[in-house]
Amino acid sequence: MSLQSQVSGRLAQLRAAGQLLVSLRPWPGRSAGGPRPRGSACGPLVALGEHGYCAWLSAGVGAWGAAGRGAWVRTWAPLAMAAKVDLSTSTDWKEAKSFLKGLSDKQREEHYFCKDFIKLKKIPTWKETAKGLAVKVEDPKYKKDKQLNEKISLYRGDITKLEVDAIVNAANSSLLGGGGVDGCIHRAAGSLLTDECRTLQNCETGKAKITCGYRLPAKYVIHTVGPIAVGQPTASQAAELRSCYLSSLDLLLEHRLRSVAFPCISTGVFGYPNEEAAEVVLASLREWLEQHKDKVDRLIICVFLEKDEGIYRERLPHYFPVA
């Protein structure tokens, strides 16, 4: 069933509920006890749309009295549960993407694959994290900048649970999912993500492409392909890794997004040494933020391994000094 058909069906159910409850709640634009608008009893519902009608109907529950509240529980609550749109394989990805873009942040929550998602405000900035660390560096690579220290975060955890504007996927060139964080993101977002990725026709190393986040708390997924390093990385591979981050940030600006979380790109099975990768990442993010700090709220370095967390805690003060 298409998304349009699903929503049309929900509206039909809501209209039926409205006919039952119309005597219990004033219509929009009608004072309590005033005459009902002429014409179809459900005419105003069409103009309100599904979410507008939901808000209007819910707002009036307290004014209905015991009888009205009882009718609401028996009739409206089951219909509200039924109004959840299915983001399974039966839905076209284009329709699902359009539908999700029209929702508020609160409305999107019912479509998340998880309930224990992490809001941006719960992720400490580097300025906050560094307070509890011995992070003084004698000769940092860059000057102290309090504003930049509030724009960068180090977070250890599951990137798929972050409620940010975008998360970055360390993808392979096919963009169709794989191992590691790539597979985790595809499983959490659902099959519609793979459906959209099929239309992107691969991605070159160092480049990035963007899709909807679907069932993820993140609104978008930025897919980038890192270099495969065998042994010590070459200058060309370092440039490609840097390009992964900068290309992703270009898309962030292009789509007017303000928060993004990066995984460790090219480390692990792609063979890029963790320490060398961290140097490339931190230099790239620092230099980019110096140019665009007013256009973003947060850049998050999201690590999964304790080893990577230790590397970034040790290297961050060299690029984002706090003392």
Curated annotation (Swiss-Prot):
<dbReference type="InterPro" id="IPR002589">
    <property type="entry name" value="Macro_dom"/>
</dbReference>
<keyword id="KW-0832">Ubl conjugation</keyword>
<dbReference type="Pfam" id="PF01661">
    <property type="entry name" value="Macro"/>
</dbReference>
<feature type="binding site">
    <location>
        <position position="304"/>
    </location>
    <ligand>
        <name>substrate</name>
    </ligand>
</feature>
<dbReference type="GO" id="GO:0042278">
    <property type="term" value="P:purine nucleoside metabolic process"/>
</dbReference>
<keyword id="KW-0227">DNA damage</keyword>
<dbReference type="GO" id="GO:0051725">
    <property type="term" value="P:protein de-ADP-ribosylation"/>
</dbReference>
<dbReference type="GO" id="GO:0005739">
    <property type="term" value="C:mitochondrion"/>
</dbReference>
<dbReference type="GO" id="GO:0005634">
    <property type="term" value="C:nucleus"/>
</dbReference>
<protein>
    <recommendedName>
        <fullName>ADP-ribose glycohydrolase MACROD1</fullName>
        <ecNumber>3.1.1.106</ecNumber>
        <ecNumber>3.2.2.-</ecNumber>
    </recommendedName>
</protein>
<comment type="subunit">
    <text>Interacts with ESR1; Interacts in a manner that is estrogen independent but is enhanced by estrogen. Interacts (via macro domain) with AR.</text>
</comment>
<feature type="binding site">
    <location>
        <begin position="265"/>
        <end position="271"/>
    </location>
    <ligand>
        <name>substrate</name>
    </ligand>
</feature>
<dbReference type="GO" id="GO:0016798">
    <property type="term" value="F:hydrolase activity, acting on glycosyl bonds"/>
</dbReference>
<feature type="cross-link" description="Glycyl lysine isopeptide (Lys-Gly) (interchain with G-Cter in SUMO2)">
    <location>
        <position position="136"/>
    </location>
</feature>
<dbReference type="InterPro" id="IPR043472">
    <property type="entry name" value="Macro_dom-like"/>
</dbReference>
<feature type="modified residue" description="N6-acetyllysine">
    <location>
        <position position="161"/>
    </location>
</feature>
<feature type="domain" description="Macro">
    <location>
        <begin position="139"/>
        <end position="320"/>
    </location>
</feature>
<comment type="function">
    <text>Removes ADP-ribose from aspartate and glutamate residues in proteins bearing a single ADP-ribose moiety. Inactive towards proteins bearing poly-ADP-ribose. Deacetylates O-acetyl-ADP ribose, a signaling molecule generated by the deacetylation of acetylated lysine residues in histones and other proteins. Plays a role in estrogen signaling. Binds to androgen receptor (AR) and amplifies the transactivation function of AR in response to androgen.</text>
</comment>
<dbReference type="GO" id="GO:0005654">
    <property type="term" value="C:nucleoplasm"/>
</dbReference>
<feature type="modified residue" description="N6-succinyllysine">
    <location>
        <position position="101"/>
    </location>
</feature>
<keyword id="KW-1017">Isopeptide bond</keyword>
<dbReference type="GO" id="GO:0006974">
    <property type="term" value="P:DNA damage response"/>
</dbReference>
<feature type="modified residue" description="N6-succinyllysine">
    <location>
        <position position="127"/>
    </location>
</feature>
<comment type="similarity">
    <text>Belongs to the MacroD-type family. MacroD1/2-like subfamily.</text>
</comment>
<feature type="binding site">
    <location>
        <begin position="177"/>
        <end position="182"/>
    </location>
    <ligand>
        <name>substrate</name>
    </ligand>
</feature>
<keyword id="KW-0007">Acetylation</keyword>
<feature type="modified residue" description="N6-succinyllysine">
    <location>
        <position position="94"/>
    </location>
</feature>
<dbReference type="GO" id="GO:0061463">
    <property type="term" value="F:O-acetyl-ADP-ribose deacetylase activity"/>
</dbReference>
<dbReference type="GO" id="GO:0140291">
    <property type="term" value="P:peptidyl-glutamate ADP-deribosylation"/>
</dbReference>
<keyword id="KW-0378">Hydrolase</keyword>
<keyword id="KW-0539">Nucleus</keyword>
<dbReference type="GO" id="GO:0140293">
    <property type="term" value="F:ADP-ribosylglutamate hydrolase activity"/>
</dbReference>
<feature type="binding site">
    <location>
        <begin position="170"/>
        <end position="172"/>
    </location>
    <ligand>
        <name>substrate</name>
    </ligand>
</feature>
<feature type="binding site">
    <location>
        <begin position="157"/>
        <end position="159"/>
    </location>
    <ligand>
        <name>substrate</name>
    </ligand>
</feature>
